[in-house]
Amino acid sequence: MSPPRVSRSWLARTATAAAAGIAMWAAFPPRNWWFLAVLGLGLLFAALFVGAPRARTGAWVGFVFGLAFFVPLLPWIGVYVGPLPWLALAAILAGYLALFGAIATVTMRLPVPPVWFTVSWVLVEALRSAFPFGGFPWGRTAFSQVDGPLLPLASVLGAPGLSAGVALFGSSVAWLLVVLVRAYRRTSTGTTWTPIPDSEGPVLPERSSGVVRIATTAVAIALLAPIAAIAATPASLDRNIATTSARIGAVQGNVPRLGLDFNAQRRAVLDNHVRTTMAYGGAIDSGQTEQPDFVLWPENASDISPLDNADAAAEITAASEAVDAPILVGTLIHNPDGRPTNSVLVWDGARGPVARYDKHIVQPFGEYLPWRPFFRLFSSYADMAGDFRPGTGPTVVDVPGRSGTVTVGVATCWEVAFDRAARQSVREGAQMLFVPTNNATFGRTEMTYQQLAMSQVRAVEHGRAVVVAATSGVSAVIEPDGSISRQSGVFTSDVLTGRLPLHDDMTLATRLGPWPEVLAIIAAVAGLLFALRSRTRFSLRPRRVAARATGDTKELDGIGD
């Protein structure tokens, strides 16, 4: 006995959702197959649109997509703490995609479904990037596009706009194909169209042609939008427009060992960075490389605070004198309230610390542990989490360079995933961005490459050069167009040098700030409320009537599964 049609439809949707999630994962670094994100969201659109499934089916489709995407994306979470945190986080994030599936299924019954698919996608990405515990933006669609032609959208509408561009492109192409296939089937079967009163919403040939035109227009807009973005903000993509520049050296000193306890040898980590910087100073003295305006060390380069430890201060001073330039030092500072801050000190060999930045967005389950007594029940690693205090004040530091003071925006490690971090720095006058990071606790996983892509998006979003200094790799020098001009390996010592353009202008994305995302969220919520209030009868009834008029039994069977 053959299985019921609904069961076959459910299995087909499930398989399509799983394939879509895997395609989305493959779009992310280190593969960078950006086009698979477009394909993945196109498949997800088809799974949620064809046959007009119920909201609960849409939720299931979204959940399957989320699992197929996040499970292979995030294994670095559990590389040293076991699979439970990794799989639990993947399941929670898949829950957000289940919410998306339910919302999109309902709102896509409104006219021009790709628009509602897109704004619903932006809504749910915003939700999981903010809640709970400050959110988890990892895996945002925008971060899969560093090698793709849609990347310039970030300079106009920010990272949320880039995510929206991918969603609109994929869903519009899928919608156009669905419409064309339906039109072909009706034509090939020689269907005779029976007039139906307009109040019932007939799907007449003229209306079908109109839908094709709308779908084609949506695809064209999605393709032309990046070109318009380049025209709107040429400075953000031209590395030669800046009138001033600074020569930098980014030091990757490496760590003595991998794992969660890499920093048990804090002095060895500091010594590694001092030794590598001293060698850099020797190369400068011998004329092998040019004198830098300043040098950048990564996060945790000196977890022995030079403000409290005279030996650490002396080592950093000696390194600064060796290169005859200030060093931006990633360190931990112990505060009077007993809670440390993850800080960057601008250390001048002659004057000591001249500026300081304390990390504003501290990482849950790493730098602090919410609900500590509760999570202690599930993992023996819970007590290894810190109790860091979030920083306040400016997100920029003024660095005295050889050619004048340079205003550097700092987004330490985890912070680069959040839109507000880099945006605040640029609005406060940052001429370039600095991302000190420590990825040693994640071993040789894909995490470091996924994070590097975030810095590339930020470069384009704000039209700024970005320097990523990593304790153990990957360190990189990123141009304002998002391209990587220099890059280190992992678990090796290295020094990356280069002259970076310094920009004072702002891209449209920086000026607009969060407003494009806010408007998309408002549109998604309004569309959902309108669709729920209308109980979707205006959408489903015309399709039932038209299907009965044309004798399309497959269409009738597919509606509402």
Task: Identify the function of each model-found stretch.
Residues F28-F45, F69-P72, Q252-G253, T289-I304, ...:
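Short, conserved active-site loops that position catalytic residues or coordinate cofactors/metal ions
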Residues P137, E290-Q291, T407, G429:
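Short loop/turn motifs at secondary-structure junctions
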Residues A232-F365, V396-G404, V410, W414, ...:
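Soluble catalytic regions of membrane-associated enzymes that act on cell-envelope
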Residues L89, L93, F262-L270, T445-T448:
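Flexible, glycine- and charge-enriched loops at secondary-structure boundaries
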Residues S2-P234, G443-R444, S455-R458, A470-S472, ...:
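Membrane-embedded alpha-helical bundles of multi-pass enzymes
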Residues I77-L84, A130-A159, A318-E321, T341-R423, ...:
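Active-site catalytic loop in hydrolytic enzyme cores
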Residues Y80, L84, T118-V119, S302, ...:
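CN hydrolase (nitrilase-like) catalytic-core segments centered on the catalytic cysteine
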